[in-house]
Amino acid sequence: MKLPRSAAGWTVAVFGLLALLVGAVGLIWPEALLRLLGFEVLESRASGDYTRTFLTASSMASFNMGVYYLLASATEWRAFYRFTVGFRLLTFTVFSVIVLVDAAPGRFFGVAAWEALGALATAAGLWWDRRGAGAAAPVSAVSSSVDPAGPASTADAVR
């Protein structure tokens, strides 16, 4: 897999790698993930308690999302980067609210903060990349259709 070629790409790659790793931990060692997120680990679960099922589904989603983010960073899919900023801020809002209404432990706010910091880092990376591209290229060459990371590879058919 190719390394990212932009600051925004690196922020997306880091998040993707961490999402993949957290997903793998949840699949392999769910109790560790529950502790990491600030949830109590019970010795036994009551009949009808689907915590483990939900955790497996969430971990698989995190693992898959990590793969998507890594693929986006390897192909410099900048539209995806921009899309993630708004949705990660929405995720921050939802996760913060569930902590504030006591539907999640206070430690879960760390997950919300991680989403906000990731969104802001990617937004800053997009700004930095745009700023650098504008300074390096003549004014007539800079437009919304020009990607500062260079031409898309043939593998990047989703652009």
PLM feature spans:
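Membrane-helix boundary elements
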Residues: 6-52
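Residue-level micro-sites within transmembrane alpha helices that shape
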Residues: 87, 112-116
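Membrane-water interface at the C-terminal end of transmembrane alpha helices
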Residues: 116-140
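Membrane-helix boundary connector in multi-pass membrane proteins
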Residues: 74, 80-83, 93-112
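Core segments of alpha-helical transmembrane spans in multipass integral membrane proteins
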Residues: 17-27, 47-73, 85-93
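Short helix-capping/hinge motifs at transmembrane helix termini and TM-loop junctions
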Residues: 29-30, 38-39, 76, 99-103, ...
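Short, Lys/Arg-rich, polar N-terminal cytosolic tail immediately upstream
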Residues: 1-5
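Short, intrinsically disordered terminal tails adjacent to the first/last structured region
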Residues: 136-159
